[in-house]
């Protein structure tokens, strides 16, 4: 329990823990390797202007434009908090479900907006992009774009690394411009270390490096 953690941390028995170990210890915080996105259902939000209005709402911008009379956000119970601007939208219903129920509702397309948690441990950023190919079973946006599909084909055949990176960036930008896939947040994991323990770091992909850890008694 918390009291036991604080006791262990105070006397040096506990050198590091993921979680909370008392106010006296400042954590090292890094990505947990998961990025949250909002996916907009293009079958229900078929007009680009409507999706862009939702995008502006998500960004907390004023003058968001014409929004649908009713919207449903499908999310997980343990997902990050809904942004204030979105939570205050009077025409929004938040449907926060356990994973199995969330998955069933997601597969049935019972949403206007979908909160999607995506692991960053893919070997290739193009994996996520392929979810939005017209024929993909994971196309939760119901997105159908010949331009985007052509971009994916070019990504798949490009062998020059820098050119391929540019194509991937362009495809991701297209999804954002058309308000289909919108980055929301990056999950964080705090690591609480004893004051004598230093040198532990975490990179943007959530990979912890303990190789440079040092303990000074």
Q: Would you name each region that the model predicts?
A:
Residues 79-90:
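Short, polar/charged alpha-helical segment
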Residues 3, 44-49, 77-81, 97-100, ...:
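Soluble non-cytosolic domains of exported or imported proteins
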Residues 11, 33-77, 159-179:
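Alpha-helical secondary-structure segments
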Residues 71, 92-94, 182:
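Hydrophobic anchor at the start of a short beta-strand
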């Amino acid at each position: 329990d918390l009291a036991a953690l604080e006791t262990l941390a105070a006397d040096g028995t506990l050198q590091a823990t993921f979680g909370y170990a008392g106010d006296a210890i400042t954590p090292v915080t890094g990505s947990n390797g998961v990025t949250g996105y909002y996916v907009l259902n293009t079958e229900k939000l078929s007009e680009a202007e409507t999706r862009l209005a939702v995008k502006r709402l998500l960004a907390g911008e004023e003058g968001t434009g014409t929004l649908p009379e009713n919207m449903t956000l499908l999310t997980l119970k343990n997902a990050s908090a809904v942004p204030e601007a979105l939570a205050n939208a009077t025409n929004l219903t938040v449907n926060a479900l356990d994973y199995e129920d969330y998955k069933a509702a997601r597969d049935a397309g019972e949403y206007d907006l979908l909160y999607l948690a995506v692991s960053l441990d893919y070997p290739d950023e193009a994996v996520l992009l392929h979810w939005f190919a017209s024929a993909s079973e994971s196309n939760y946006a119901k997105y159908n774009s010949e331009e985007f599909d052509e971009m994916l084909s070019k990504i798949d055949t490009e062998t020059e690394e820098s050119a391929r990176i540019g194509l991937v960036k362009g495809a991701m930008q297209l999804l954002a411009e058309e308000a289909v896939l919108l980055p929301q947040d990056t999950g964080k994991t705090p690591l609480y270390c004893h004051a004598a323990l230093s040198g532990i770091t975490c990179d943007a992909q959530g990979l912890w490096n303990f190789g440079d850890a040092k303990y000074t008694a």
